[in-house]
Amino acid sequence: MKKIIYDLGSNNGDNIPYYLLKSDLVIAVEANPKLCEIIKKNFKKDIDNGKLVVENCIVTVLPDNEDKDFYLHRQHHVLSQFLAPNKSILDQYLKVKLPSRNIISIIKDYGEPYYIKIDLEHYDSYILKELLLRNVYPKYLSVESHSGEIIDLIIQNGKYKSFKLVDGSQVPKRYKNRMINNINYSFPIHSAGPFGNDIDGQWMEEKNFLFLLSVVGFGWKDIHCSLEDKPSKYYFPLQIIFYSKKKVIRRVIKIIIFFMVIYFVYIKFFFNLRQTTF
């Protein structure tokens, strides 16, 4: 079967080189016209060879082919979004009219997805709900998760049983000089990072993954799901903690050291007390 990757929220194309290595066809969906021009310029050869398609549109769950309001961030293009920003920060955005397409319509045009990456600045849950409602289940799926809503939707649906986590802030350092299809590859800053079995660690079952999320929290983190891979049942709490970022590991080590010091102080005090008593 043809491997098709849907990059929903392509930005300036940081993920595309990796996705081209992992698929037969990449569908890059990006609302910002200037960023789409950058993608078209940088990947002209792949577009000409039929390996890459650029959809310059807002991806929505609404009726197809309608111009809609979109909010371009004036300083940081990665923060541009479809939903209206909070009034307190609205002046940081430029409101423009851009073409839109329904996510299901896009998939019907290009074919069954092998992997879908969703990174749409506060619109992620809308797209995820629509995919699950329409029974669109790619073998691999990732969604940026700033709250518990994403994992709740996935678990309530019940289709995906295997999970991994990618911390966006760690991607450039953690996934540097990796062998991808016999090519030495490093993921750039702002890249979504790897998917599938290119992510470090074993796949987790639900209860272990929820424990991991309780340790590391939400934010700039992508939840990855798989229909292809069975989860490991033998993750222990310390393994899960070491799966996560170094700050958490250091925090846990400090706590362990603290309690060890308390323990040895107590033992020494008790021993001295016994000596003075007898």
Predicted regions located by residue number:
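Conserved acidic-Pro-Pro-aromatic motif
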Residues: 3-4, 18, 22-25, 104-254, ...
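Glycine-rich adenosyl-binding loop in Rossmann-like folds that engage adenosine-containing cofactors
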Residues: 60-101, 105, 110, 183-186, ...
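A short helix-to-beta-strand connector/capping loop
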Residues: 46-53, 93-94, 112, 137
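Cofactor-binding loops of NAD(P)H-dependent oxidoreductases
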Residues: 57, 101, 118
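Short, hinge-like loop/turn segments at secondary-structure boundaries
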Residues: 44-46, 70-75, 134-135, 158
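Alpha-helix N-cap/helix-start capping motif
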Residues: 33, 76, 101, 121-122
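SAM cofactor-binding core of SAM-dependent methyltransferases
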Residues: 1-65, 145-147
